[in-house]
Amino acid sequence: MKPLIPKKKHGPEHEIQEDIIKFLRYRGWFVKPTHGNMYQSGFPDLFTTHYTYGHRWVEVKDPNRTGDPFTHAQREIFPLLCANGSGVWVMVGATEKEYEKLFKKYNWWQYTGVNR
C-alpha cells in the first residue's frame, strides 16, 4: 500500500506570489496581500506602495496555467479600478523583466486575450 501524500495547501500561484512579495520588499515596497475571501472578491492579490513610485495593485498569475486566468469578479472589478485611477498589473514571476512592468501602463487586459 502506498503512503498517503497530503495535498499541498497552496498551488504554484501562491509560491510565485511569495517570491514576488520578497522581491518587492527587498526593493523598498510595502506589500499587503489580500485574503481572497468573499469580502474581497475580485480584488487583485497584492496591494503595493512605494515612497517614490506610488501604489500598484498586483495580480499574480501562473505563466503555465491554461484557460481563463481571471474570475468573473476580477473581470468586473479590474476595469473599474483602472477607470478610477488605480491600475492593475499582472506579474508572473519575481524577475527584473516582470518588475519593469510596474513602471509601464497597467497590463491586466493583456492577459484576457482581448486586443485594445
Mark where each language-model region is.
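Catalytic phosphate/metal-binding cores of nucleic-acid and nucleotide-processing enzymes, i.e., regions
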Residues: M1-R116
